């Protein structure tokens, strides 16, 4: 029986999710359709309701609706609750369920490059993207997790929820790290958070949650120009999609060759 999935967001035209899920479908021999839905700021909740009334099996949610999807759900996973945002929805026993697969997607992609245990990790930015990855990063048992933001107060809000982290402002960054994660939106507008030279002097591994299929993001290029190994978030996108696919279909697809295909497009 043909299963129906979609991703909703605004903008949505450039989403790679339909391509990724069709690749998963071919690999696992599941018949499905996966559509793009342009989110309507006024009618978003009605759009969610209509999708499932019309026999939708699962829905991915992207910017700017993850918080509204979270609030709409009746049942949430622990990681979804801690993230305060949802990117994966489905119906079960007539109740809307929600999960957030971004964090596990990041961890799985990062594991290709380095071990997180006992590492010093810096997250740039204290918005929703940062909040969504803190819990899974803490589960990996780093030596230290620091969140840096332009305004310290916003970082302190995260610290109140996650007391295990330390916070600072960009201006006060002085120490070195093993891993730096850009969770700001700067790359989306081709801008860079300029870091003090001493922060990059030990050549930390640098990871940008944003991705650009054709070229490097601004942050990745900035880090590479300073001698650091750096990658963008395309692998995270594929891994979070695989986790959503597993939630909906109870089959975990293989991601390595799909990521390689996307990189070669």
UniProtKB/Swiss-Prot annotation:
Q: By which gene is this protein encoded?
A: aroE
What is the originating organism of this protein? Legionella pneumophila (strain Lens)
Can you cite an annotated GO cellular component? cytosol
The name of this protein is: Shikimate dehydrogenase (NADP(+))
- How is the quaternary structure described? Homodimer.
In the UniProt entry, which residues are flagged as the active site?
66 (proton acceptor)
Pathway participation: Metabolic intermediate biosynthesis; chorismate biosynthesis; chorismate from D-erythrose 4-phosphate and phosphoenolpyruvate: step 4/7
Report the family membership.
Belongs to the shikimate dehydrogenase family.
Task: State the protein's purpose.
Answer: Involved in the biosynthesis of the chorismate, which leads to the biosynthesis of aromatic amino acids. Catalyzes the reversible NADPH linked reduction of 3-dehydroshikimate (DHSA) to yield shikimate (SA).
Q: Which GO terms describe its molecular function?
A: NADP binding; shikimate 3-dehydrogenase (NADP+) activity
Q: Which UniProt keywords apply?
A: Amino-acid biosynthesis, Aromatic amino acid biosynthesis, NADP, Oxidoreductase
Which GO biological process annotations does it have? amino acid biosynthetic process; aromatic amino acid family biosynthetic process; chorismate biosynthetic process; shikimate metabolic process
Q: Does the keyword Flavoprotein apply?
A: no
Catalytically driven reaction(s): shikimate + NADP(+) = 3-dehydroshikimate + NADPH + H(+)
User: Can you tell me which residues bind NADP(+)?
Assistant: 125-129, 149-154, 209, 233
The record's EC number reads 1.1.1.25
Q: Which cysteines are joined by disulfide bonds?
A: none
Which interval of the chain is the signal sequence? Answer: none
Q: Species lineage, top-down?
A: Bacteria, Pseudomonadati, Pseudomonadota, Gammaproteobacteria, Legionellales
**Superkingdom of this protein's organism:** Bacteria
Residues that, per the record, bind shikimate: 15-17, 62, 87, 102, 211
Record-linked InterPro entries: Aminoacid_DH-like_N_sf, NAD(P)-bd_dom_sf, SDH_C, Shikimate_DH, Shikimate_DH-bd_N, Shikimate_DH_fam, Shikm_DH/Glu-tRNA_Rdtase
Q: Does the UniProt entry include the keyword Amino-acid biosynthesis?
A: yes
Q: Which Gene3D superfamilies match?
A: Leucine Dehydrogenase, chain A, domain 1, NAD(P)-binding Rossmann-like Domain
- State one Pfam family annotation: Shikimate_DH
């Amino acid at each position: 029986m043909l299963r129906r999935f979609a991703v909703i967001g605004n903008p949505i035209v450039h989403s790679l999710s339909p391509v990724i899920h069709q690749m998963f479908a071919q690999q696992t021999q599941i018949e499905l359709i996966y559509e793009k839905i342009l989110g309507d700021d006024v009618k978003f909740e009605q759009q969610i309701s209509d999708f499932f009334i019309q026999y939708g099996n699962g829905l991915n949610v992207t910017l700017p609706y993850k918080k509204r999807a979270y609030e709409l759900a009746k049942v949430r996973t622990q990681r979804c609750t801690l993230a305060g945002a949802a990117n994966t929805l489905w119906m079960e026993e007539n109740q809307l369920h929600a999960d957030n697969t971004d964090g596990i997607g990041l961890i799985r992609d990062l594991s290709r490059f380095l071990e997180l245990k006992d590492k010093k990790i810096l997250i740039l930015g204290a918005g929703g993207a940062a909040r969504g990855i803190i819990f899974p990063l803490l589960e990996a048992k780093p030596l230290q997790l620091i969140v840096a933001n332009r305004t310290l107060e916003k970082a302190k809000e995260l610290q109140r929820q996650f007391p295990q982290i330390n916070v600072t402002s960009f201006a006060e960054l002085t120490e070195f790290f093993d891993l730096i994660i850009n969770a700001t939106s700067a790359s989306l507008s081709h801008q860079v958070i300029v870091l003090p030279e001493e922060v990059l002097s030990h050549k930390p591994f640098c990871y940008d949650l944003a991705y650009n299929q054709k070229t490097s993001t601004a942050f990745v290029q900035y880090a590479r120009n300073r001698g650091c190994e750096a990658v963008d978030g395309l692998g995270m996108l594929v891994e979070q999609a695989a986790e959503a696919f597993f939630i909906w279909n109870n089959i975990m697809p293989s991601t390595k060759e799909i990521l390689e295909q996307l990189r070669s497009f």
